[in-house]
Amino acid sequence: IQKSVGTEKTFSSDLSSVKDILIELNILANELEKRLFISKKKGKTITLKIKYYDFKQITISRTIEQYVNKKVDFFLIVKDLIIKASLIKPVRLLGISISNFKNLNIKQKKHQVDFNF
């Protein structure tokens, strides 16, 4: 059973400006939205992964009340998480994932009664 859906990117040159980081997070959020649509999942926990140039890694998560799978619903949270991360070093990798799912692909079982004549 899949526990999360996410995407990440390692950069060939480290990102230092918040503007560049937000541009890359926007691209990652677009990809994440596609993956959530394909997997037919909505989640309540948004996680931001940051790996710095020195390979130190942090993850920051927030769990919200509603299930989301659209960028418009989770990207503001991603931006808030990046602000809380206090970026003080150049960034080597960024990732976004969503977990704590509500499965949208629940199929009702059909029951059929067999009669032996």
Where are these regions (language model features)?
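DNA-contacting surface of Y-family translesion DNA polymerases
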Residues: 1-91, 101-106, 116
